[in-house]
Amino acid sequence: MFDFDATLPVMALQFILLAVILNGIFYTPLNKALDERADYIRQKETDEKERLAKAKELAQEYEKQLADARKQSQEVIAAAQADAQKIAAEALAKAQKEAQAKKEEAAVEIAQQRQAALGVLEQQVDVLSRQILEKLLGPELVK
């Protein structure tokens, strides 16, 4: 069926020689190119992971700074509101004090004017009463 002559070893030798030549000419440069490409991809992936980590870190720092700025602005606003309320309360107290003083002044003045008016009215009543009595009783009886 099969003849085992020199053809089989020659073909095996040719196959091995072809494999060695292809390995040297084709497979080694191809493997080298594939390895270089894989290294390049791994390097880029590592670089991108580092950039992503740095970007996340910067974003966290930015968020922290933003939160601090918001907190400070809220504190400033609260302090300004407290100052404004204090100033408004002082102004209101001053205005109320001035109004109370003017009210008391007006009350004293009204009381004085009332006393003066009552005094004048009393004198006029006395004069009118005397005149009425004189007319009714006559000037000789009224003294």
From Swiss-Prot:
Disulfide bonds: none annotated. It is found in: Cellular thylakoid membrane. Keywords: ATP synthesis, CF(0), Hydrogen ion transport, Ion transport, Membrane, Thylakoid, Transmembrane, Transmembrane helix, Transport. The keyword Ion transport applies. One of its GO terms (cellular component) is proton-transporting ATP synthase complex. It is a single-pass membrane protein. Its main location: membrane. GO terms for molecular function: proton-transporting ATP synthase activity, rotational mechanism; proton-transporting ATPase activity, rotational mechanism. The chain crosses the membrane at residues 6-26. F(1)F(0) ATP synthase produces ATP from ADP in the presence of a proton or sodium gradient. F-type ATPases consist of two structural domains, F(1) containing the extramembraneous catalytic core and F(0) containing the membrane proton channel, linked together by a central stalk and a peripheral stalk. During catalysis, ATP synthesis in the catalytic domain of F(1) is coupled via a rotary mechanism of the central stalk subunits to proton translocation. Belongs to the ATPase B chain family. F-type ATPases have 2 components, F(1) - the catalytic core - and F(0) - the membrane proton channel. F(1) has five subunits: alpha(3), beta(3), gamma(1), delta(1), epsilon(1). F(0) has four main subunits: a(1), b(1), b'(1) and c(10-14). The alpha and beta chains form an alternating ring which encloses part of the gamma chain. F(1) is attached to F(0) by a central stalk formed by the gamma and epsilon chains, while a peripheral stalk is formed by the delta, b and b' chains. PANTHER family: ATP SYNTHASE SUBUNIT B', CHLOROPLASTIC (PTHR33445:SF2). This is ATP synthase subunit b'. It comes from Rippkaea orientalis (strain PCC 8801 / RF-1) (Cyanothece sp. (strain PCC 8801)).
